[in-house]
Amino acid sequence: MPFTLAIVGRPNVGKSTLFNRLVGKRLALVDDQPGVTRDLREGAARLGDLRFTVIDTAGLEEATDDSLQGRMRRLTERAVSMADACLFLIDARVGVTPTDEVFADILRRSNAHVLLGANKAEGRAAEAGLIEAYALGLGEPLALSAEHGEGMAELTGALMPLIDAFEETENAETEDAPETDVALDPDAEEETVVRVPTKAKPLQVAVVGRPNAGKSTLINQLLGEDRLLTGPEAGITRDAISLAMDWDGLPVRIFDTAGMRKKAKVQEKLEKLSVSDGLRAVKFAEVVVVLLDAGIPFEQQDLRIADLAEREGRAVVIAVNKWDMEDDKQGKLKELKEAFERLLPQLRGAPLVTVSAKTGRGMDRLRDAVLRAHEVWNRRVPTAALNRWLGAMVEAHPPPAPGGRRIKLRYMTQAKTRPPGFVVMCSYPEKIPESYTRYLVNGLREDFDMPGTPIRLTMRSQSDANPYKNRKKSTPSRLRKHLGKPSLKG
């Protein structure tokens, strides 16, 4: 595991701005309103030659444990315990506040290695705050400006000995580990081209849904620990939080997204940023888990979210949460399946699983459904099998003959995976009705065991494959005309 640095401090001192600078991307929401970041967010940081993991945390606040701020504080304390070092930020322009003093005392008593950073230190207005920071007893403060990139060399110098010491310890542990030989069969055939998730490219799963459907609670259950802030308040999650996890040796990166509401209801500037962040997470994901509330399933916004995931070409799993609160489970399940088939025909056959994020029931079913959806999304069908299948489908139900012209479906191949995409070479592709395309897509789903995954089917004329079609025949230049054809004898 890489060296981990947690950025902590009270709200609005510039933690997310510094996080974005270290990661090199705009991953965290940034606003001048305190308390924008509410969860733990991880990123791969680059600072000069240094490479490490950085955690952006919720703002430290003095608050009762039952309040939202109290839960944010507990989550931050957890990040400090997980990290190899933490960078405690204060606002140099404001100076040291009583809240800074309280949390500096907490950090001094912790076992963590603490660096002190005085952010927003650009300009003369920050000089007094920089001097005040010495009184916190955390060593010499680093004068930083996350917004303008100032002080990064000093931060590099402070982190370098910590990371070097960490890597020496890691290398010593690796050298002591036993070696394992893996025998490879040179005659083994590669039957599929399915990409197996790796640490560098893990399986990417996004959990989406309306506000307060239980997305963060669900992810905490899958992780086996409280990494995301949860509570009864709707809209607690404001960023698309990305977390790494391991499913029985399979590397997975899971995205918790802000709840998506109708555009008319998304008025606050921060919520608009959060929802667009969630939409971006859907585009990055391979499998999208659409989380419904069992009490009010398949609301209009649920249908929009599921349709968006399908149009983006993602594998989709429907998960119905709060199942522990249902009394007539059999009757409710039958009702859900009927509504699913009626309201989301474009996702016909996609997995529908019932879960309880609160109690942890159904987590194994959900995980199996995600892995199955991913496998189908990556599936490739041999060309010979496709063309035998196409012949049988045409024989059973020939395409129509508009205007007396018989349409011939000559050849079929799979052009892509993720999601599966097929091309049929035919005559008059523009004349093939949508109903016949649906007939073929439904047949592909059923006969090649591809339930629920988006399938793209394109009808193409054989002449479309000719790159020289509609190109004018080149005429000889005046010089060639004058010289005539070159003699073969030279």
Curated annotation (Swiss-Prot):
Residues 469-484 have a biased composition (Basic residues). GTP 1 binds at residues 9-16, 56-60, 119-122. GO terms for molecular function: GTP binding. InterPro entries: G_ENGA (IPR031166), GTP-bd (IPR006073), GTPase_Der (IPR016484), KH_dom-like (IPR032859), KH_dom-like_a/b (IPR015946), P-loop_NTPase (IPR027417), Small_GTP-bd (IPR005225). Residues 3-167, 203-378 form the EngA-type G domain. CDD domains: EngA1 (cd01894), EngA2 (cd01895). Residues 379-465 form the KH-like domain. Belongs to the TRAFAC class TrmE-Era-EngA-EngB-Septin-like GTPase superfamily. EngA (Der) GTPase family. GTPase that plays an essential role in the late steps of ribosome biogenesis. This is GTPase Der. It comes from Dinoroseobacter shibae (strain DSM 16493 / NCIMB 14021 / DFL 12).
